[in-house]
Structures are given as C-alpha cells and as structure tokens.
Amino acid sequence: MTTGLPSKYRALVLEDHESGFQIKILTTPRPDIGSAVVRISVAGILPYHRDVYDGKRPNSFPTPLVGGFGAIGHVAAVGFDATALKPGQLVYVDCVIRARDDPDSFFLAAIYEGSSNGSKKLMRDVWRDGTFAEYAKVPLENCIPLDETRLCGNLGYSVHDLMYMAYLLVPYGGIRDIQLEHGETIIVCPATGFYGSLGVQIAAVMGARVIAMGRSEEKLAKLVEDVQKGSPGATIETVKITGDKDKDANALRVFGAADAVLDITPKAASMSTHTKSAIKALRRGGRVSLMGSTENIAVPEIMVNNITLKGKMMYERETILHFVKMLERGLFPLSKDFMETKVFSLDDWKAGLDAGAEHNGIGKCVTLAP
C-alpha cells in the first residue's frame, strides 16, 4: 500500500505567527487505517489565507503545522481498509474534516480548529497538517474521486483550474441545503463579495434566475458581466442596497416574489438591512440559507409567510459528490477564456499568498504547485 512513497518530502511549515512559514524537509507520512497519502498537484490559496497565517484574522489552530486547506492530487498510497480508492486516482482533497464518532466535531484543515473540544483534539492530535506540501496524509472520506479522463481529457479542464471548485463549494452548500430548483428565483445578498459572487455564478449555472443585491452599482454590473462571460444565458437582475429595508424590498418585488435567499453576510455588515429586505420579498413558503454573520433578520414576514430559515456551515460530503457530478457534466465554465488561474511554486509561497488576497472572484483562482 505504500510502494513508491519517498522517504522525505518538502512542505511549507508555519512554526508560529511570529516566525512565519519556512520550507522544511519532513518524513513522508505512511497511510494507516482510514487514511490516504496524496501526491499534491495543486493546493488552493484563499483570499484570506495571508491574514489567517499572519495572525490578523482570529482563526485558532495549533502550531507548528503545514499550511493549506484543499487540493487536487493523485492518490499515492491508501490504508488497508480502502475498498474503492486506488493509487494513481485523481482526487479532490476536501478541507472539512469531521470526527467519525461525532459529526458535530469538525474543523477546517490547517485554517480553523473548530469550536468543540473534540474538533480541537482531532486537529491537534491527528489531522494537523494541510496541503501546502508535496504529500499530504488525509482521511479516506476527504478524498473525492474525480474522473480525470472526462475532466482533463474530454472537457479540457486543467488540474490547476479544477481547484476553483474549492471556492464554489461553500455557497453551493447553502444553495443545495435549501433545495434550489431550475427555474426558481433566488436573491443573493450581498452579492459582490467573494463567496456571494460565486453564489450568483452557481445559481445561474443551475438554471435559476438570480437577483443580486449590493451597495455598488458598478460592482453589480461587473458581476453580471463576469458571470455571463462564462454562462451567456444566465438571467441576473441587480438591486442596489440603499439601507431602506422597505424601499429595497419593493425594488426586489419588481421582479416578482422570489423563491429563495442565499445570505452570506460578512461580520462587518451584520447589522445591514439587506437580509430583512430579501426576506420581505419572498413568496409564501420561501426558503433562506444563512451562511454569514447576520444578526438583524427579525421581520414579521418570517412567521406570516411561513418562511423557512436554515443556517449552514460549509457543506456535507454528499454535497461535494453532487457538485462533482455537475462538474463532470460540463456545467461549470472552466475554459481558458474564462478562468484566470495563477500558479506559484512552493518556493514562491509569499507571492502566492499576496496574489490570493488580490486575485479572487468569478473565474479567478490562485494555487501553489508543490
């Protein structure tokens, strides 16, 4: 099961916030029961990765650790209990790691240890290291098989561009949780941020009509342009957030009663009125996915119109599998004329983290290639 693994590998190790990253030579991990070792082809870089590791973002995690989060790579070796996963297989390595005996204990690989004692123990003692490395040992269930012939052959996607799926999965988790259907109308708010804009793209690809809310008309126009570049048939309306909840609700109602809302409000905007406006514009029986820091959502329409509110943190494994099916059917534009992927070597990690903070949004992806 471990044939062909080198004795050593290179990894980007964070000793602590003050010392920063260093490239180190580590002993290559061996798979045991319930795990796989993956040869990393590309590791994704998040827009906020730099702030996480600089200590500017209050994410808690143990150190030292290998940085990263998700990745695309080939299985190098598997534990003896693996029945489907095989060496050589292309996989997406997902960052959401859950305790097998307690699904409520979960953390985000190499960026956040979670909030429970169980999740903190699991990260500290078992799955501490991320994917900024030549190899990574990960749970079997976090290796999502990808059809390499279909994706990289028939559809012509590059391995680097496939990393874009890690960004899309977050808003897709909320969209799938409220069971958005083809032809429905969904309000995305706010829509011009990182995950909000990706939520607009996903909903449009799924055949929904999207109403995008944002404070900047210029950014909203650019959002529509970017999404329609990859999906020319996408139906996207825009509504400017004015701060007057009733005025904004009326502006939304111009397009008819909406079926659903995807809310990914950043903490800094948690008291904004846009979520109230969106809820007021829903039809009776409408659904809301709350994926952000919303503290100000109380409106009578929730009760009067039988509105369903569902909180969602990240996504489930089943959601990833369903997303991959859509990806393998060619529903998501990942062509060279749409994708703008920047690739950095492990040695050039600092420039990669800097690029990740600036180069993000629709069709944009930044990766490390160990």
Residues of each region from the PLM?
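Glycine-rich cofactor phosphate-binding loops and adjacent beta1-alpha1 units
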Residues: 180, 201-204, 211, 224-308
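Mid-domain Rossmann-like dinucleotide-binding core that forms the NAD(H)/NADP(H) cofactor-binding site
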Residues: 153-243
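C-terminal hydrophobic helical "lid"/dimerization subdomain
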Residues: 2-7, 173, 246, 272-276, ...
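Residue-level marker of beta-strand positions
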Residues: 89-90, 135, 185, 205, ...
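Glycine-rich beta-strand-centered segment in the early N-terminal region that forms part
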Residues: 27-44, 56-107
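NAD(P)H dinucleotide-binding glycine-rich loop of Rossmann-like/cofactor-binding domains
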Residues: 98-187
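Residues in the short beta-alpha loop(s) of Rossmann-like NAD(P)-binding domains
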Residues: 216, 294, 315
